[in-house]
Amino acid sequence: MDPKTALLRALLLLLFLHLSPLGGRSHPLGGPGPASEASAIQELLDGLRDTVSELQEAQMALGPLQQGHSPAESWEAQEEPPARVLAPHDNVLRALRRLGSSKMMRDSRCFGRRLDRIGSLSGLGCNVLRRH
């Protein structure tokens, strides 16, 4: 075999072993066994049972307080959502319409809005009413 080819194959093998999930190593023998997994699952199950019993006790404590109400009544008692959900969007649309239909912009033939405002105060500009 050619030395270049052998070197290339060795480098590819090392790269493959480096990028493999286990890094070319096998599973350790002293890893978590079935007994430790079973005890962890048992602890989770015990915690779940405790949580369920606490929730049931809380529900029983609230039960007598809500005996006179049916589910439909409690649903109706909840606040209704606001009728207009897109209020900020509508405000933006109104502002854009005002900009497009501004009287000052329609009447002004010579200057922009700022110059019109200055012109109305100083007597300069196109749409200035002369007071003599």
Curated annotation (Swiss-Prot):
Main subcellular localisation: secreted
Modifications after synthesis and translation: The precursor molecule is proteolytically cleaved, possibly by FURIN or CORIN, to produce the active peptide. May undergo further proteolytic cleavage by various proteases such as DPP4, MME and possibly FAP, to give rise to a variety of shorter peptides. May be cleaved at Ser-102 by the prolyl endopeptidase FAP (seprase) activity (in vitro). May be degraded by IDE. During IDE degradation, the resulting products initially increase the activation of NPR1 and can also stimulate NPR2 to produce cGMP before the fragments are completely degraded and inactivated by IDE (in vitro).
Subcellular localization: Secreted
S-S bonds: 110-126
Region (Disordered): 62-87
Keywords in alphabetical order: Disulfide bond, Hormone, Secreted, Signal, Vasoactive
Biological-process GO terms, alphabetical: blood vessel diameter maintenance; cGMP biosynthetic process; cGMP-mediated signaling; negative regulation of systemic arterial blood pressure; neuropeptide signaling pathway; receptor guanylyl cyclase signaling pathway
InterPro entries: Natr_peptide, Natr_peptide_CS, Natriuretic_peptide, Natriuretic_peptide_brain
Signal peptide: 1-26
Site (Cleavage): 97-98, 102-104
GO cellular component, one term: cytoplasm
Superkingdom classification of source: Eukaryota
Any single Pfam family the record assigns to this protein: ANP
Recorded family membership: Belongs to the natriuretic peptide family.
Family matches, as PANTHER family: ATRIAL NATRIURETIC FACTOR PRECURSOR (PTHR14066), NATRIURETIC PEPTIDES B (PTHR14066:SF10)
Purpose of the protein: Cardiac hormone that plays a key role in mediating cardio-renal homeostasis. May also function as a paracrine antifibrotic factor in the heart. Acts by specifically binding and stimulating NPR1 to produce cGMP, which in turn activates effector proteins that drive various biological responses. Involved in regulating the extracellular fluid volume and maintaining the fluid-electrolyte balance through natriuresis, diuresis, vasorelaxation, and inhibition of renin and aldosterone secretion. Binds the clearance receptor NPR3.
Name of this chain's protein: Natriuretic peptides B
Taxonomic source organism: Felis catus
Organism taxonomic ancestry: Eukaryota, Metazoa, Chordata, Craniata, Vertebrata
Gene label: NPPB
